[in-house]
Every structure is written in structure tokens, then in C-alpha cells.
Amino acid sequence: MSAKEVLFGNDARVKMLAGVNVLANAVKVTLGPKGRNVVLDKSFGAPLITKDGVSVAKEIELEDKFENMGAQMVKEVASKANDAAGDGTTTATVLAQSIVTEGLKAVAAGMNPMDLKRGIDKAVIAAVAELKNLSQECSDTKAIAQVGTISANSDETIGEIIATAMERVGKEGVITVEEGQALENELDVVEGMQFDRGYLSPYFINKPETGSVELETPFILLVDKKVSNIRELLPILEGLAKTGKPLLIVAEDVEGEALATLVVNNMRGIVKVAAVKAPGFGDRRKAMLQDIAILTGGTVIAEEIGLELEKATLEDLGTAKRVVITKDDTTIIDGTGEETQIKARVAQIKIQAEESTSDYDKEKLQERMAKLAGGVAVIKVGAATEVEMKEKKARVEDALHATRAAVEEGVVAGGGVALVRVASKIGEVEVINEDQKHGVVIALRAMEAPLRQIATNAGEEGSVVANNVKNGTGNYGYNAGNDTYGDMLEMGILDPTKVTRSALQFASSIAGLMITTEAMVGEIPQDAAGAPDMGGMGGMGGMGGMGGMM
């Protein structure tokens, strides 16, 4: 085991604070509408230009191991805020820096670190409760667009495209962000339920110009097994022939005689039919078949629940307004399932997603939920260069997380105003001694730090702006984008409550741990000079004689 170096008391705290300041100073320049860019060096390719706090934080590693410990702890603040709400990483870093700086000053002056931490914790609990009181519901498209715009550093096009996507696929719908091919951002929406299974035979195609199968108001047969014997399908096909409606078969597989007979019947125009494989594998396939059944108002024909294909009737079939099948995908549009059952199924899947510990399972469950709830939207980010593309894509992802958080917990006045109002409304927090009281003061002072930093980045004097805002009431605040004061909600400057709450909670949690740190232990680096030399290689000098080998 290698030797360790240990720092105690003030020596440890000074080093730790130095690391906190290096990371926080690099991150906080990105805050607000007039925040600056940070350029990140990459080992290969062009450097990355970003205004995303967590991206900057992740790149920072310091040479001094004790300073690096401080930096890594603040990096954890940004990371946790990003995981919880997807945004607010810079705000969390600014809050943490303020609490740590003031807290360590108080410790150096002889105050009890544990009481300071208790005071900070009490203030934050009161602040979170007050934030919930200030929060307003965010449900209309305009408010969603405003939240997206603010999070994307005042880029209105990003806010609008996210609001449109949410309007099209619903609050539970899946919205993904991809790199586009054009210069402008594009929105691609797949409405209805789409799964990645295409037609089993090209002979089912009835739209040769697009190479697809289109079925209008079809019946949908769902079978949880392989179908190879046509006799099993005869009762259904005979019933269908009388209705004159088309049929979509979704089964584990359709093969051999069954597939050949369906193709022949389809080509002769006796029955309009198409067959696709069921999506997924194993238990996931069973679950997705059940999803389709609920969406279309049908029943999954499965032998394990005592249903046989030969005995199936038209009542067991689902229906939809339209089905489109390409060689890769099947889309069921406007299934005729009962709305109450669909909502119950979505709620059930949502619970499973929340309880799941696997990121992959969570993602798949959210996809299923979206397909039932409305559809999938893809935002294709457009840019002129690869460097701009990466920067813009990161902003779109941030804005998307922020709008989801806003829909979930509501919004408060943006621009750091909500925290200033919360600090003024908390009033007297119950404490048992002067040190705890000072801890409360530290937390309340830190709540002004984001507003001060936004003003500083806009070229204004932070303390002057903070005083002007404190003298106002309600949503009155400073719009750094155009250097004016007014009602933040009316100006469309909104922050998701969840983002502000998460930033405050994570910042105070990690900062509290740093204030109560009394010793730091780091590894002493191995001295490279101490390694054994490569003795004995000197004899290689005789190799000079190899010249005669030529």
C-alpha cells in the first residue's frame, strides 16, 4: 500500500476551497442569457464549445490532489442536479460555491461546523416548502415554449420546436434529439403506435409507389405463437371475407403453408391481408402484444390463457383507423381501444418504469408508454458545422429536460428571482444557538448568488441589481437579456420549480459535507526516479558490428 499525505483543519479547508473555486469559476461564466462560452480541449477532433455547466464541470481535473478533491465534490453537485432535473447545473454550482466560501470563513472564525450545517439544512427545508407555494402550473404551449427558450440560452426556435413536439405527442410522449442533415432544426413526429417489424412478404405490398402496405379500417389479429398451419386461420378468414375488411396479423411468426396461402389469397383479391412479426422478445413481446391489444380493443390469442386460434372469432380482433407497413416498420394509427383502459395501462407502465433499476428497462418502458399515450417526436438539430452541432444539441437536450421538469412540478419566476423571494419570505427559522443562526444567514445569502452572477455575466454590478430586485415584490426581477426590470412571468422568464429545488438541495447537501470536513487524505505519487534502471543493456554496444551484415 502506497504512503498517504494527510492535511488537517485549516490547511485542508484552504486547499479544498481552492479546488472548489477553480471549478465553480469556470462553470459560472456560462450562467444567464449573456453567459459566455467555455472551450473544451479534446484529445482528437475539434475542441468543444459549450455553455452547459455540467459539460464544463466534467472536464475539470486538477493536478493538486487535495484541490482536486474539492473540485470533484462540486462536480458531484452539477452531476446530481443534471441527473435529477436535466438542468440547473450552473445554478447548483454557484449556490454550492457561495455556501462553501461563507461556511469555511465562519469555521475559520471559530464557529461550530456541525451547527452551521444544521442551520443551512433548516433554511433549505424552509426554502423548498416556500418554493412549492410560489410554484405555478405550466400546461399551456406558450409557457412550455418560454421555459425551453430560457433553458436554451434565449434561443426562441428551440423553445418553440419543443413546445410543438409536446403538443403533438402529449406530455407522456417520447421526444428524442438527433443530429440533423439541414441547417435548420426539424421536427419529425410519428403519430400512433410504431414498432420495428416490417411485412413478412413483399407480395403484401399494395402501394408500389411507396413500397408499403396500407390497410384502411383493418381488423387486427394478435397471436402469441408461430402460425404455420392455414387451418388455424380459416374460421377468421371466412368471417372476414363476409365483412370485406382487411386483416393485419401480428404473431411471433407466420411461416410455411400459412404464409404462402395468405400471399395467394391477397394477390387474388379474395382477402386483403398482411402479416408482421410481433415486436420484442420473450416477456417484452408478450407485454407489447398486450399493449397493442389494449390500444386496438382486441384480445391476444395465447394458449397459456386457454385461447386457441381455431376458435377465435371477429370479436377477439382489434381494429384501427389505419395501418401502414413498410419493410422495416409497422404503424397503427387511431386504435379503437377504450380510453380508460389505455390510461390505466399507461399508469401501470409508469409505475414499472419508476420502480425499475435498469436504465435500459426504464428506456424501453418509457417508449411503450409513449406509443400508447400518443406517439414519438424526433427533433433533428440543424447546424453549419460539427462544433456548432454538438453545442446546439446539448442546449436542445437541456431545454427538453427543463420543459419536462416544468410540466411535472410547475414554474417559478426565472433569472434567480424565485430564490431571492424565497429568502425574504422564510423569516425566522427556528434555531437553538448563534452558530445555527449564522448557518441560516449563509444559506439565505447564497440564494442571492445566482441573480448576482447573471447580472455580472451581463456586465452589470451584481450587488446593485440584487438590491434593486430585493426592493421589489412578487415576480419583479432583472431581465439580463435586454437589461430591463419588470414582471418576470410577463416577460416569459420562467424556471422549472424542480430545477430550482434540485439545485438548492444538492448544493446545500454537498456544501454542508465540505464545511464539516476536518482532514483530507491523499496518495503520495510514486517517484518515477525511484524505478530500477535497465542495467545490463550496455552490452548492446556491440551491435555496432552489425554494419557488416549489409
Swiss-Prot record:
A family per Pfam: Cpn60_TCP1
Keyword Cytoplasm belongs to the record: yes
GO terms under biological process: protein refolding
Assigned keywords, A-Z: ATP-binding, Chaperone, Cytoplasm, Isomerase, Nucleotide-binding
TM segment ranges: none
Compartments where found: Cytoplasm
EC number: 5.6.1.7
Taxonomy, superkingdom: Bacteria
GO molecular function: ATP binding; ATP-dependent protein folding chaperone; isomerase activity; unfolded protein binding
Main subcellular location: cytoplasm
InterPro entries: Chaperonin_Cpn60_CS (IPR018370), Cpn60/GroEL (IPR001844), Cpn60/GroEL/TCP-1 (IPR002423), GroEL-like_apical_dom_sf (IPR027409), GROEL-like_equatorial_sf (IPR027413), TCP-1-like_intermed_sf (IPR027410)
Role noted for this protein: Together with its co-chaperonin GroES, plays an essential role in assisting protein folding. The GroEL-GroES system forms a nano-cage that allows encapsulation of the non-native substrate proteins and provides a physical environment optimized to promote and accelerate protein folding.
Protein name: Chaperonin GroEL
Gene name, Swiss-Prot/TrEMBL: groEL
